[in-house]
Amino acid sequence: MEGALRRRGRVMTLSVRRLTPDDYDALRALRLESLRLYPECFAADPDQEDAMTKEEWLSRLSTAVSFGGFVDGVLSGMVVFSKPSRPKLAHTGDVGAMYVRDAARGTGLADALMTALIDHASENVEQIQLTVNAENPRAIKFYERHGFRPIGRIPRSLHVGDRYYDDLLMLRAVSTSD
């Protein structure tokens, strides 16, 4: 996907594509940024991820499908689709690591990323699920706009500092096959 957007009198080029090993440096920087700025929204620990080797990062790219959103050629957003390896779960997929830089919010980049993920998922699974911080109404509304529905609440799902956060479990059908 590629397109242009005019914002504050400036034309920006937006594009979304699957990330590759060539995107390692930008992907690593974006992921660590997301974990440090919004620790209550991600289960991963920034210090542990920062300590990962390049090979460990690249292994993730080979075991999941990572989409990158670019603004004027700069990686500014990401989302990851993963599929369980167990045969009984092969009809399901998971959405993870959804993040768009503050400067790129409101540009349509998040919508383009989620559309790319849903398009990919619809060719591979029947339903996709995700968890989202129950105190993040903007993210919840975003996922609802993309067809996700809350199906449960996970109390005290994350413990960050001295606070606990609940997560909502959300689900979306992407295929009508039985």
Predicted regions and their residues:
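Short hydrophobic/aromatic beta-strand or adjacent loop that forms the aromatic wall/cage
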Residues: A64, Y165-L169
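Conserved beta-strand-loop-alpha-helix junction that forms the acyl-donor binding cleft
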Residues: L130-I140, S157-G161
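Conserved active-site alpha-helix within GNAT-family acetyltransferase domains
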Residues: T107, D111, E135-R153
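Conserved GNAT acetyl-CoA-binding A-motif
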Residues: A121-T131
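Glycine-rich acetyl-CoA-binding "A-motif" of GNAT/NAT acetyltransferases
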Residues: V74-G77, R138, Y164
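Conserved N-terminal entry element of GNAT/NAT acetyltransferase domains
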Residues: M1-D22, A29, E33, L168, ...
